[in-house]
């Protein structure tokens, strides 16, 4: 899964540490999310989207193969 978290953080002038504190995770979790090495829970995805006043699908991008297992 690809994410646009880094892009949104830059737009809001926010560090990984600041975002992590806002959503209640460690900075390393944000690092892994941004690198596509971790799929967030629905709850975490929702929290991150709320921080940026965005929709979950604006931040997390699935390709069809990932989504449908093709």
From Swiss-Prot:
Ranges in coiled-coil conformation: none
DNA-binding region: 16-35
Protein keywords: DNA-binding, Transcription, Transcription regulation
Statement: the UniProt record of this protein carries the keyword Transcription: yes
Domain HTH cro/C1-type: 5-59
Single GO term (MF): DNA binding
Pfam family, one: HTH_3
Entry-linked InterPro entries: Cro/C1-type_HTH (IPR001387), Lambda_DNA-bd_dom_sf (IPR010982)
Protein name: Uncharacterized HTH-type transcriptional regulator AF_1793
Native species: Archaeoglobus fulgidus (strain ATCC 49558 / DSM 4304 / JCM 9628 / NBRC 100126 / VC-16)
